Each structure stands twice: as structure tokens, then as C-alpha cells.
């Protein structure tokens, strides 16, 4: 399905009852082909979705609320368009469910079907809200650099690394990531963490490269995969992981993670801007 056929940018009609058909899948293949990925993926990882506006009725009609987290594997054939996800979650509001487990099972079944792969779902009830973490991405901030730039479309030629020197291990972060929705043109604001082992990447060039996404149109997942591949090809690290946390829209935030080596899943901790 093409993004142009999704609910994005169209007048919204909110469902009165639970409706799984509201979920609008978008194949990953098209964007990946544009990046030159036509066979085996050069990475693995997860898209972490947090939903803060989930509510339903219990069997007696009393409203219930929870924060939901969805873990969508990067190898799934589809992503779900975010506005359709919002409308789908909104359809729970006037529908009765017998238990929290029933809601979780319904979410897992529907979102897994839309994505074409098994999606893990966690629900946090109000009595556990205090346990939800908030912290900034760990690493050396690139934003400390005072530099000039005038490139606002992705340009991998900005990237370079010291190929003739001994490899290093670094974790670098920036809060200056911005991209734009390919359907509505609305800006998407994010923070990005880059961990690598290999030739030392030029920090100023990397920051200019991150800034160069400022006028780019692409879904969150596609932008992170482009960043991953551009760094991999231009800088040739032995190990690479890219993790972005985008600010919330419509009660949802999307946090893609891509890596080419085995490591634990990153913490799903909100940043201050989320």
C-alpha cells in the first residue's frame, strides 16, 4: 500500500468501536530498494513504538488506561502508518474488554498481522507509571561543536573517517536530527545515538551529515536506515549501531534501532523532548 492512500493528511473520522481494519501497512521494500537493499538486510534491529493515549472500557463500562510499547522487528515486511495506528488505538476507547491481558492479546494479534511479523507488546498500568524512565541518550554530544553548514538534504560525502589510524570505539549523540513526513510535510524532531568500532569518524562531518536531513522527507524508520548505511559505506566501521528517538505526535513516539552486531536492546527511556 502506498502512503498516499493512508489516512495521513485527510479529514479524520474517529471510529466509535474497536476496528482492526484501521491499521494501514506500508511495505518496507520500496524505501529499502532506494537505498540499494535488494536481498539480505545489512542490519537487524527493532522499531520501538510507545503509545500514550490508549484507553478502553472494562466489562462494567469503567474506562481503563495504559501506556503501550510495541517492538516491531526490522525484518518485518511492513511498517504501520502512524496516523492509522493512532486511529486504531483510538477505536478501543468505547469498546469493552474483560482484562488487561485481553487488550494486550488483541493489540499483539492485530499489529503483528499488519506488520507481517510477530510484534511484542507491553502494557504499563497507572500504578506502575512511576517506574517509567526518562533519560537522555548516552554518549559524547556532537552538538557541542561550533560549525558552519548550509547542506539540508542528506549528503553522505560529508562523512569521513581516519582509515589509516588505529580503530576506536565511540558513542556519539545529537539532538539536531530533523526529517519530514513524506505525505504531510510535517517536521519530525529527533535525537540520534551512533555507536561504532572502527576508524575514527570525523565529528564535524558527522554532525553536518545529521543536520543535512533537515529538509529530507522520509518516515522515521527509513531515515535511520539511510543514516546507518551511509555511515557504514563511507566510514567502514567494524561494528555500527544507530538508535533514534523521535518526539511524540498523536500520542505516539517512534524509536528505530539498527545494528550489525549482537548487543542488548537499547533502553526504552523517554528523552526530555518526548
Swiss-Prot record:
Q: Say if the entry is tagged with keyword Zinc.
A: no
Q: Which domain of life is it from?
A: Bacteria
Q: Which GO terms describe its molecular function?
A: preQ1 synthase activity
Q: What class of enzyme is it?
A: oxidoreductase
**SUPFAM superfamilies, from UniProt?**
Tetrahydrobiopterin biosynthesis enzymes-like (SSF55620)
Q: Where is the active site?
A: 181, 188
Q: Name one GO biological process term.
A: tRNA modification
Q: Which GO terms describe its cellular component?
A: cytoplasm
- Compartment annotation: Cytoplasm
The main location class comes to cytoplasm
Glycoprotein as a keyword of this entry, yes or no, is no
Annotated residues that bind substrate are located at 80-82, 220-221
* Subunit organization: Homodimer.
Function of the molecule: Catalyzes the NADPH-dependent reduction of 7-cyano-7-deazaguanine (preQ0) to 7-aminomethyl-7-deazaguanine (preQ1).
Q: Which NCBIfam families match?
A: QueF (TIGR03138)
Q: What is the designated name of this protein?
A: NADPH-dependent 7-cyano-7-deazaguanine reductase
Q: Which organism is it from?
A: Burkholderia ambifaria (strain ATCC BAA-244 / DSM 16087 / CCUG 44356 / LMG 19182 / AMMD)
Amino acid at each position: 500500500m502506498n502512503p498516499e492512500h493512508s489516512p495521513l493528511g485527510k479529514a479524520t473520522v474517529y471510529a466509535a468501536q474497536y476496528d482492526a481494519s484501521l491499521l494501514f501497512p506500508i511495505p518496507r521494500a520500496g524505501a529499502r530498494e532506494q537505498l540499494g537493499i535488494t536481498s539480505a538486510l545489512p542490519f537487524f534491529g527493532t522499531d520501538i513504538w510507545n503509545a500514550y493515549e490508549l484507553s478502553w472500557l472494562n466489562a462494567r463500562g469503567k474506562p481503563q488506561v495504559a501506556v503501550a510499547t510495541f517492538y516491531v522487528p526490522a525484518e518485518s515486511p511492513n511498517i504501520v502508518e502512524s496516523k492509522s495506528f493512532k486511529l486504531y488505538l483510538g477505536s478501543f476507547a468505547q469498546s469493552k474488554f474483560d482484562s488487561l491481558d485481553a487488550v494486550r492479546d488483541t493489540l499483539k494479534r492485530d499489529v503483528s498481522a499488519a506488520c507481517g511479523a510477530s510484534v511484542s507488546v507491553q502494557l504499563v498500568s497507572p500504578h506502575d507509571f512511576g517506574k517509567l524512565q526518562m533519560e537522555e541518550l548516552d554518549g559524547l554530544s556532537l552538538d557541542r561543536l561550533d560549525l558552519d553548514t548550509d547542506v539540508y538534504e542528506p549528503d553522505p560525502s560529508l562523512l569521513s573517517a581516519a582509515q589509516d589510524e588505529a580503530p576506536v570505539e565511540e558513542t556519539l549523540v545529537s539532538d539536531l536530527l530533523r526529517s519530514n513526513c513524506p505525505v504531510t510535510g510535517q517536521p519530525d524532531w529527533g535525537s540520534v545515538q551512533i555507536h561504532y568500532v572502527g576508524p575514527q569518524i570525523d565529528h564535524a562531518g558527522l554532525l553536518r551529515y545529521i543536520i543535512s536531513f533537515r529538509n529530507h522527507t522520509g518516515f522515521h524508520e527509513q531515515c535511520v536506515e539511510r543514516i546507518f548505511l551511509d555511515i557504514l559505506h563511507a566510514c567502514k566501521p567494524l561494528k555500527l549501531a544507530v538508535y533514534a528517538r523521535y518526539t511524540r505526535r498523536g500520542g505516539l513516539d517512534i524509536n528505530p534501532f539498527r545494528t550489525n552486531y549482537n548487543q542488548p536492546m537499547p533502553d526504552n527511556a523517554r528523552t526530555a523532548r518526548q
